[in-house]
Amino acid sequence: MEKFINNAPFALVLIFLVMGFVLLIKGADFFVEGSSSVAKRLHVPSIIIGLTIVAMGTSLPETAVSVSASLTGNNELAVSNVVGSNIFNLMVVIGVCAMIATVNVAEETIKRDIPISLVCAGFLLLLGIVGLGDKEGMILGHFDGIIFLCAYAVYIFHLIKTALKASKEDGKVEIEGGSDEDIKLVSVPMSILFIVGGAIAIAIGGDMTVDAASRIAGDLGMSQTLIGLIIVSIGTSLPELVTSIVAARKNEVGMALGNAIGSNVFNIFMVLGIASAISPITIVAENIIDLCVLIVFTVCVWIFAGTKRKIGRMEGSCMVALYASYVVYIMIR
């Protein structure tokens, strides 16, 4: 695939990039639907399905891109894809939602999820600079990846324990992915087909996206960091943006911020954890700057959310404007 894309006309490379996005997004949808159906047939509680399979499914495109980039030595793309996606989810997806309809913020999002998200970004910054598992800094090595994966396992165990307790006390708890009725049951053969077909589509889409993005960066004289921060991260996050806009128009954005924060935690701990555990990832100076920007933006959203327990049109406009300013900065730096 890489050899073919490198020798293809530029217009065809752009088509391959779009095709890669489509395969990633649709593959993730099929994989989640098949996995959720199997889990439901095995009588796995919907709370656990929502917090694991469904929540992770939204980040499968980022996972595929970063793992593929890590394996092919495109380290800048592996990190910038995750950081760029986190910034886009936080500032644009939530910002646009807030511009359409007020986003109410749950107390646990302010007291638990946003602080954990800040710890994640700070932890990545620390490991990126120090490189605890390697002799030299600026590298996420195998040991660092294992640390990330273990940290996420503890985090998800805490979420499941908390959700199950809330479910017993209140009889119902909101989760990403919705309630029992939102999980479609399909036949076992069809579920297996969805899982296998979705996984294949994700793998092919990840390789296609990375190869096309690398070729575009080379032809336009742009760094892989820039391509990852803007084009790839936005492409893999478009489903969340479209879904959030539709929900905002129906005034159903109560879980929007919590879901975005949860996705950001997954992207850092699991996506980069898997990628670096498979193949060490080099951190470049630009990644450090972008991580600092992510931390600053997260603090801004924390302040917006904490003042009135909601994010309104004014705050949403500020968030989108901050993101636009950031894009201008990374294009001229």
PLM features: what roles do these ranges have?
Residues 1-333:
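Hydrophobic alpha-helical segments, chiefly the membrane-spanning helices
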